[in-house]
């Protein structure tokens, strides 16, 4: 996924009201950015970090600038825009870069499924294959050399695990895909210490046959690419 035009840098002053952040540009101008991330963003929003932002040409947007990446003071790169994870996997599927999900001729997005009024992130179909339902999660929380999901209690994420497990019960293929969008993360684990119920449902879903895939990425102001498989812990 390319950023066109290239992202612009600024220094983070603070994040507030969940969806907003104030930054100062190299020229000294203060801007308010939109932040498309409802999580805690632990370790991703430290004042003084370098923020990389995009600018929309939509005149109707109240906040035309969007926070895309954080370059931390520890030299890690993090994609904080959770909307990018789906796009990254979609592009990787079209380019046949995820071996475990290859061989499907049709990729659909936001298809209704399940029993809890959900829309699946991606649905893969092919005449000779079982339908494959994929939920995509962005992993950005780094603690003790491990990446954790979620970074806050997520009822929505719990629902998705139930829906995926139901798809397996219905004879379909179901995949939980962790897109690791933090350059410092080399392994992934469910965050039992943050959302114990999510971790319980994660274990139940995995035992029921839901597949778990974790892929790392390369990140820079020019773009992001899913590149390599990462190990899953517990």
Swiss-Prot record:
<dbReference type="InterPro" id="IPR005224">
    <property type="entry name" value="SfsA"/>
</dbReference>
<dbReference type="Pfam" id="PF17746">
    <property type="entry name" value="SfsA_N"/>
</dbReference>
<dbReference type="GO" id="GO:0003677">
    <property type="term" value="F:DNA binding"/>
</dbReference>
<dbReference type="Pfam" id="PF03749">
    <property type="entry name" value="SfsA"/>
</dbReference>
<comment type="similarity">
    <text>Belongs to the SfsA family.</text>
</comment>
<dbReference type="InterPro" id="IPR040452">
    <property type="entry name" value="SfsA_C"/>
</dbReference>
<protein>
    <recommendedName>
        <fullName>Sugar fermentation stimulation protein homolog</fullName>
    </recommendedName>
</protein>
<dbReference type="InterPro" id="IPR041465">
    <property type="entry name" value="SfsA_N"/>
</dbReference>
